[in-house]
């Protein structure tokens, strides 16, 4: 297991490339899972250097993710690598019909994902002393190229 604390989107995707290359050099059949938590919290190099009152820096994350996902999906496409991203839901303002929720970072992640699962907190699990010891969650498969979509657990 390898843990990295990376602050920018660029650093995250460079690290993914390096991990995939090194693992494939040593063992081509090894099962690998790479978890990125959380993409919404990561900044870009432009955001880190820019002033908040200047326009244009907010879209740079989506552009970087789009370019990186095209490259990464080609690298891991036919290998035994699971790339898992956690992201945050944001509410779209003024939506009258359809899903009012979206994820940050543009449309590249939803497009390139083979499976997307939305988790929702539905309650708490408490012990006999009424201390919270866990959370009840609902999982909804909202995209699945590997099986039937729109299932719940």
Feature map (PLM): residue ranges:
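Conserved inter-motif catalytic segment of the P-loop NTP-binding fold
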Residues: 1-71
């Amino acid at each position: 297991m390898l843990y990295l604390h990376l602050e920018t989107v660029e650093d995250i995707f460079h690290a993914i490339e390096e991990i995939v290359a090194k693992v494939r050099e040593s063992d081509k059949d090894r099962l690998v899972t790479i978890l990125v938590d959380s993409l919404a919290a990561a900044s870009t190099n432009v955001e880190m250097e820019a002033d908040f009152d200047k326009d244009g820096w907010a879209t740079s994350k989506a552009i970087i993710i789009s370019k990186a996902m095209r490259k990464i999906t080609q690298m891991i496409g036919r290998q035994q690598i699971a790339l898992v991203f956690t992201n945050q839901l944001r509410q779209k303002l003024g939506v009258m019909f359809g899903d009012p929720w979206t994820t940050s970072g543009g449309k590249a992640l939803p497009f390139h994902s083979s499976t997307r699962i939305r988790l929702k907190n539905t309650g708490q699990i408490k012990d006999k002393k009424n201390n919270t010891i866990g959370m009840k969650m609902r999982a909804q498969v909202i995209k699945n190229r590997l099986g039937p979509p729109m299932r719940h657990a």
